[in-house]
Amino acid sequence: MQGPHLSLLLLLLATMGAVLQADTVEELTNTRGLIFLEDGVWPPSSPPEPLCLVAVRGEGDTSKASLTVVGGLHSYEHAFLEAVQESRWGPQDLATFGVCSTDSQTTLPALQRLGAWLGETGEQQLLVLHLAEVIWEPQLLLKFQEPPPGGASRWEQALLVLYPGPGPQVTVTGAGLQGTQSLCPTRDTRYLVLTVHFPAGAWSGSGLALTLQPSKEGATLTIAQLQAFLFGSDSRCFTRMTPTLVLLPPTGPTPQPAHGQLDTVPFPQPGLSLEPEDLPHSADPFLETLTRLVRALRGPLTRASNTRLALDPGALASFPQGLVNLSDPVALGRLLDGEEPLLLLLSPAAATVGEPMRLHSPTSAPWAAGLARRVAVELQAAASELRDLPGLPPTAPPLLSRLLALCPNDSRSAGDPLRALLLLKALQGLRAEWRGREGRGRAGRSKGTGTDGLCALRELSVDLRAERSVLIPETYQANNCQGACAWPQSDRNPRYGNHVVLLLKMQARGAALGRLPCCVPTAYTGKLLISLSEEHISAHHVPNMVATECGCR
């Protein structure tokens, strides 16, 4: 019974030491395992909000890593940290924290991680933020105090700790939470914990928006019931216990075991830009320039090896594409009608190193003048369209101009149509690949990035001040959906349909889709807006204003 009172007394003594500008720093130790250090350890540039540095003492009186508290550490927050540190996560401990199950919750791993951190020696700090503001209507919003300057950018996960009063089992959703989470309080429950992903919105935005739905069908919580449930009574101080936001330290790389077999994968070597001296020598300036253009548009490659690819013409003839007789104008006309890739097989004599690789043979390939003019016209059109594509590297236009100079550019002259055909097919392939990159950029919501992960709800604040008719709110948390749509589909939203399942399977098999599956909102909630009309001020509940769930469509 004396532990919490002693903790408060020691904290008071530490604060008095800072006020008196003590020259020495002493550790004030209580009997429950936490060490309160004097405020004198903080530099003069500390933020104006009072800070408390707390270190955890483990078994054997060993010094542990410290945690930072914005404001003073309450006795019930102190008790929560001790309960986490001492838990062995059996059934009784799960009941203490209101954990429903061990297989479908994200809360238990986060609590275990916090407990392991409290029991280890380290230099990183744990940040504890107190509640600054709560809004009950039209939606529950919890806003917390700001962390010290420069100390919030590296926090990626947090625990929202509730010190509950009596209440039912509920399902909790909201922006910032890691999916839908459940709370299962019992008579033995002292704490309820929710996992928050990227918690910066808890202090920089409008706050954490939470929706609590009782598990009993048709039941709802009134504001009075919600207040009694989330803000438990502190019988010692005759006050309410307010929620706390505990920012977990970033997860470091997992150490490899010292025993067993270790599979190692070397880091890929950085790509090397192929300078002119790095390119394989070719006696034909056309082929050499075309190689430079292809490599400039397809990005930097690793240094070329001396390995040559041996192609068997007999095996290639059995491929579905088949072989095209370039001396047949009809076959060449069909080739121009499509944009399929073209593979030219040269004779071994023409491919000899140091010998010019001539692609034209006027005596063996009598082209019709009309077909040659068509090749020249389409070549100029493809080159013009390629120049207009956004984001081309600066080396591409000069190389393209040189290639056109090496090809017949007069539509009235047959010239060397085989060389022009080769350039035309190359430009068609490069144009299609560059368009595909642009399309993948536009479909970024579907494919996502390395930091986005799977399709999930993300925080998005919308500014309504541009809508002059809307008075309140000026900004609100509308949320958005972002992330990868891939097979197997994430089970965060079980209401996806068979149509998107088939699309995702086709995408996984590499099938071409006109539209990739996209991460979009699948459920919304309304928002209360106060607007100004010509006659009066009115309040309207506008539907579909806040995205609450995401899925692939």
UniProtKB/Swiss-Prot annotation:
Residues flagged as site, Cleavage: 445-446
InterPro entries: AMH_N (IPR006799), Cystine-knot_cytokine (IPR029034), Muellerian-inhibiting_factor (IPR021203), TGF-b_C (IPR001839), TGFb_CS (IPR017948)
Alphabetized UniProt keyword annotations: Differentiation, Disulfide bond, Glycoprotein, Gonadal differentiation, Growth factor, Secreted, Signal
Tissue distribution: Mainly expressed in granulosa cells from preantral and small antral follicles.
Primary location: secreted
Gene3D superfamilies: Cystine-knot cytokines
Post-translational modification: Preproprotein is proteolytically processed to generate N- and C-terminal cleavage products that homodimerize and associate to form a biologically active non-covalent complex. Binding of the non-covalent complex to AMHR2 induces dissociation of the pro-region from the mature C-terminal dimer. The N-terminal portion of the protein, despite having no intrinsic activity, has the role of amplifying the activity of the C-terminus.
Domain of life from the UniProt record: Eukaryota
Annotated disulfide bonds: 455-519, 481-550, 485-552
GO CC annotations, alphabetized: cytoplasm; extracellular space
Glycosylation sites: 325, 409
Extent of the signal sequence: 1-22
PROSITE patterns linked: TGF_BETA_1 (PS00250), TGF_BETA_2 (PS51362)
Residues cleaved off as propeptide: 23-445
SMART domains on file: TGFB
Biological processes per GO annotation: anti-Mullerian hormone receptor signaling pathway; gonadal mesoderm development; Leydig cell differentiation; Mullerian duct regression; negative regulation of ovarian follicle development; ovarian follicle development; positive regulation of gene expression; positive regulation of SMAD protein signal transduction
Subcellular location: Secreted
Molecular function GO labels: growth factor activity; signaling receptor binding; transforming growth factor beta receptor binding; type II transforming growth factor beta receptor binding
Known partners and oligomeric status: Homodimer; disulfide-linked.
PANTHER family assigned: MUELLERIAN-INHIBITING FACTOR (PTHR15009:SF4)
Function: Plays an important role in several reproductive functions. Induces Muellerian duct regression during male fetal sexual differentiation and plays a role in Leydig cell differentiation and function. In female acts as a negative regulator of the primordial to primary follicle transition and decreases FSH sensitivity of growing follicles. AMH signals by binding to a specific type-II receptor, AMHR2, that heterodimerizes with type-I receptors (ACVR1 and BMPR1A), and recruiting SMAD proteins that are translocated to the nucleus to regulate target gene expression.
Family: Belongs to the TGF-beta family.
This protein's name: Muellerian-inhibiting factor
Species, as recorded: Rattus norvegicus (Rat)
Organism taxonomic ancestry: Eukaryota, Metazoa, Chordata, Craniata, Vertebrata
